[in-house]
A protein has these predicted regions:
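Secretory-pathway lumenal glyco-enzymes, predominantly type II signal-anchor Golgi glycosyltransferases
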Residues: 2-512
Length: 512
């Protein structure tokens, strides 16, 4: 157990993931831009400094205590910014880590330009070594222990979420900090969604959850209660699928907690008076990755040769230079390859590991990227090539839509197979050489890969452009703003129409 002291309170962090993490946060408290790369000794406070802090604290009490009677009164000094903790939901992959550093430096520079004390800005992937911190709930006790007494608000943003600090100050001033607030741009389902386990099936629009791209905020009062609940209730979790929906459910707590409060200034579409903005759904890192550097593996079986395979051939197959269909039988008309692994009704772990072994063999061209999809996956290879330009194939990269399993109990993350699993050659080589393997041929391949990568320290890299389900299973507000890369399943839809409407570009850049 690690005991942290903040003000007059002691906060015990019993989770072993957080033991020994106090030193990095003394650095983060000072907003040292070099904190991601070095941790310095915490400065000592002089008597004058302590007296100054006491005076500031007294002023803040007066200000916030009278805020409800003077809502139009301008913010006093830099109190709001200095009491704001911004958590950038960064990732360990080098591309995403760099994006996180850049966002942090931009926020701190903007604060300096305002002539005010800066907020605390943290990179999520640096808070501890635990891979599951991306699900937010596991890290709330640590944030509360370190910043619970100094912060009034906690803002969670993505790497490409812009923060307009002076507008954000005005927005947060509207909400009394002693109360529990959960703020964001509201999304809702238009129909019962498999992604959300068909929650609120009688009226899916009745439950709101925040758009992660616009950012979402917790008041310190709510944050502290959630952290204490996580510490005391021995919470269990199985699958983490749609992060902000599940966080909203956790906060709402069957009506015992607050629902999301819609804040129009939390934006994804640029307009006047935005406190946050988000525009970079599909990054531009230069020319797309070459078609000749990607190998596509399609998993199929005999009963779908005449049903699903024709959809692949009529939609996205033409954008692949190297593509093979792997089945339980050989069919020269497609053609398919029999890897000698019996077909299974579920899981397909044996087939996937056989695909990876073939990818590293001399039987196929030596390229940097392996893309493994189901025969009912719809995918835009031109958009994928544009995204892959951002990643270094010399790194161990496992990319796709990230899910989690048992993350409140030191579980693991994985990329969902239906949305497509993208692996660098380096990642495949490290995985196979580790000796990690299927416990049975019908084990869930995507989950086994995630467990294996977690065990050898390879991070799972998330992109919201991959989708395990169909377009209608996601919020229309968000999905229409994306340049999606994939969808999954042919149930009750015209898959060709889905591909045409959601994934096909009028002028794909296919010359490379």
């Amino acid at each position: 157990m690690t005991m942290y002291t903040r003000g007059r309170y002691n906060f015990a962090v019993t989770n072993p993931r957080f033991t020994g993490l106090a030193a990095p946060y003394s650095c983060q408290l000072r907003n040292d831009v070099s904190c991601p790369r070095s941790v310095k000794q915490q400065p000592r406070l002089s008597c004058l400094s302590i007296m100054w802090l006491m005076a500031v604290n007294w002023s803040l009490c007066f200000f916030f205590g009278s805020a409800s009677n003077h809502e139009d009164q301008p913010a006093q000094g830099s109190a709001v910014l200095e009491e704001l903790v911004i958590v950038i939901q960064s990732q360990k992959n080098s591309y995403h880590a760099q994006r996180g550093y850049q966002r942090k430096e931009k926020i701190l520079q903007d604060a300096a330009n305002l002539g005010e004390g800066p907020p605390v800005v943290l990179l999520l992937h640096e808070l501890s070594d635990y891979e599951g911190n991306w699900s937010i709930l596991p890290v709330l006790p640590l944030l509360s222990a370190i910043y619970g007494e100094s912060a009034s608000w906690f803002l969670f943003i993505e790497e490409d979420t812009m923060v307009i600090l002076h507008v954000l100050q005005k927005v947060l001033k509207r909400y009394p900090i002693q109360e529990e607030w959960f703020l964001g741009q509201r999304l809702h389902d238009n129909k019962p969604s498999i992604v959300h386990h068909y929650a609120f099936s009688e009226d899916p629009t009745s439950f709101g959850y925040p758009d992660p791209a616009a950012g979402w905020a917790l008041s310190a009062a709510l944050h502290q209660r959630l952290a204490e609940r996580i510490q005391s209730e021995n919470l269990k979790s199985d699958f983490t699928i749609d992060l902000t929906h599940e966080i909203a459910l956790f906060i709402w707590e069957e009506g015992r907690g607050p629902k999301l409060t819609t804040v129009p200034e939390f934006c994804t579409k640029t307009r006047d008076n935005c406190a946050t903005k988000f525009t970079n759904y599909l990054p531009n890192c230069g020319n797309p990755e070459s078609k000749n550097n990607i190998f596509v593996a399609v998993k199929t079986c005999e009963k779908y040769h005449s049903v699903r395979v024709p959809v692949v051939k009529s939609t996205w197959e033409k954008h692949a230079v190297y593509l093979e269909y792997y089945s339980d039988v050989t069919d020269a008309s497609i053609p398919t390859i029999n890897l000698g692994v019996p077909n299974t009704e579920r899981g397909h772990c044996g087939k996937t590991f056989a695909i990876m072994r073939r990818f590293l063999s001399e039987a196929v061209p030596k390229v940097d990227w392996l893309v493994i999809v189901d025969d009912d996956t719809l995918i835009s290879l031109p958009r994928l090539r544009r995204l892959l330009r951002c990643y270094n194939p010399k790194e161990a990269v496992s990319l796709g839509e990230r899910y989690g399993y048992g993350l409140m109990q030191n579980g693991y993350s994985y990329t969902t197979g239906g949305g497509g699993m993208v692996l660098s050659r380096t990642a495949v080589s490290i995985l196979l050489s580790s000796g990690c393997s299927c416990y049975s041929d019908d084990a869930p391949d995507d989950m086994v890969l995630g467990r294996c990568f977690t065990s050898i320290g390879v991070p799972i890299t998330h992109s919201p452009l991959f989708h395990q389900a169909q377009p209608d299973d996601y919020s229309g507000t968000r999905i229409t703003l994306q340049h999606s890369i994939s969808f999954h399943k042919h149930w009750s839809v015209d898959p060709v129409a889905v591909y045409t409407n959601w994934l096909q570009d009028s002028h794909p850049n296919d010359e490379l």
